Amino acid sequence: MSAATDIRPLIGLAATRPLTGTEAEAAFGALFEGAATPAQIGGLLMAMRVRGETVEEMAAATRAMRARMNRIKAPEGAMDIVGTGGDGKGTLNISTATAFVVAGAGVPVAKHGNRNLSSKSGSADALTHLGLNVMSTPEIAEAALAATGICFMMAPVHHPAMRHVGPARAELGTRTIFNLLGPMTNPGLVKRQLTGTFDRVWNRPMAETLRELGSECAWLVHGGDGTDEISIAEPTWVAQLKDGEITEFQISPEDAGLPVHPFEAILGGDPARNAAALRALLDGAQGAYRDAVVLNAAAALLIAGQAADLREGAEIARTSIDSGKARAKLAALAAQVGAPADPNG
C-alpha cells in the first residue's frame, strides 16, 4: 500500500456499505502507514462503527495490523488471555492473574496487553506496580516466554504502526474497531484464546473472525454483569470456536463447582491496590477474586486442552495457586524482564 493512497473514497464507501476484504485491508494499510489525516481516520472508524463492523472487515484489518507488528516466536500450544476492554466496570485484574495461574499449570501464555482502558488499572499498570518492566523489547518477551512459559507484550511496543491512529482514537474517546482488533493481533500469533468482549453481540462475530484467521480453539465471553471476562456474579455468554465449528452457550460459576459472589466483591482500585490484591491472591488469599480467577483459568485450561471440563480446570487452577507455581511464574517473569524505570507507572 503506497503512503500516497487517498482513503477518502473508502471512507465514503464505508458509510454506505460494508467494505470488501481488499478494500478494508487497503484502508487500514493506509492508516498504519501514516497516509491518513486524523479527520480521515476518525471518519473511517466512525463510519464503520455506526454501520457495524463486519467479520470480513475485522479479518482484513487484523491482517493489515499483523503484517506490521513486531512478532515473537511462541511455542506450540501457547495461548492468550485478554479482554477487549471498554466494559467500564473497574474490576480487579482478572485476566492478568489468570495468566499466571494458567502458566503455573504448564500452559505457555503469551499475554498481550496495555494500560488501563476499562478498569482503573490495566494489566500493564498492575504489572508495573508488581515490579515488572512491561516495556521490554520483543526479543526479551520471546526469551522470557521460552524460559519461563509466560510473557507480557505491551501493545505499543509490538504495534508501532498504531502510533499513526492513537491520537485520533484518543480524540474520539469512544469504542472503535480497534477495541475488537487488539485481542486478535497477538504478536505470538497464538491459535488458542480466552477473549472477553465488552458486549455479547460481538462474541460470535469475533469467533468467526478468529476462525477466518486460523485459530484452533477460542472462547469469546461476556459476563452477565457486563464484564469482558467470565463472571463470578452472573451467567456468562460464550461463543466457542473449536475444530472450525462455533457453538454458543451459557456457563455459570456453579459449572466449575464455584460459588456465586456479588459483583462488588471484585471491584478494583488504583494500580497499587490491584497489584497488592494480585500478589495476595498468588500467595493463597481466599475470596471472590480468587474464585473469579479460578473460574477464568478453568476455561483457559479447557481451551488449552489440559482439562476435560470446567470442574477439572478449576481443580488444576487451585493447585497452581496453592502449590506456589503461579506465584513462581510471576517471580520468574520479573527476573527475565527486569524492573520498570518508574515503578509508579
Curated annotation (Swiss-Prot):
GO biological process: L-tryptophan biosynthetic process
UniProt keyword terms in alphabetical order: Amino-acid biosynthesis, Aromatic amino acid biosynthesis, Glycosyltransferase, Magnesium, Metal-binding, Transferase, Tryptophan biosynthesis
Cofactor binding remark: Binds 2 magnesium ions per monomer.
Documented EC number(s): 2.4.2.18
Source superkingdom: Bacteria
Database matches in InterPro entries: Anthranilate_Pribosyl_Tfrase, Glycosyl_Trfase_fam3, Glycosyl_Trfase_fam3_N_dom, Glycosyl_Trfase_fam3_N_dom_sf, Nuc_phospho_transferase
Binding site for 5-phospho-alpha-D-ribose 1-diphosphate: 83, 86-87, 91, 93-96, 111-119, 123
Cellular component aspect of the GO annotation: cytosol
Names of required cofactors: Mg(2+)
Binding-site residues for anthranilate 1, renumbered to this chain: 83, 114
Disulphides: none
An MF annotation (GO) of this entry: anthranilate phosphoribosyltransferase activity
Keyword Glycosyltransferase tagged: yes
Sequence positions that bind anthranilate 2: 169
Reactions performed catalytically: N-(5-phospho-beta-D-ribosyl)anthranilate + diphosphate = 5-phospho-alpha-D-ribose 1-diphosphate + anthranilate
Pathway: Amino-acid biosynthesis; L-tryptophan biosynthesis; L-tryptophan from chorismate: step 2/5
HAMAP family noted in UniProt: TrpD (MF_00211)
PANTHER family reported for this sequence: ANTHRANILATE PHOSPHORIBOSYLTRANSFERASE
Family listed: Belongs to the anthranilate phosphoribosyltransferase family.
Function of the protein: Catalyzes the transfer of the phosphoribosyl group of 5-phosphorylribose-1-pyrophosphate (PRPP) to anthranilate to yield N-(5'-phosphoribosyl)-anthranilate (PRA).
Name assigned to this protein: Anthranilate phosphoribosyltransferase
Source organism (scientific name): Paracoccus denitrificans (strain Pd 1222)
Gene designation per UniProt: trpD
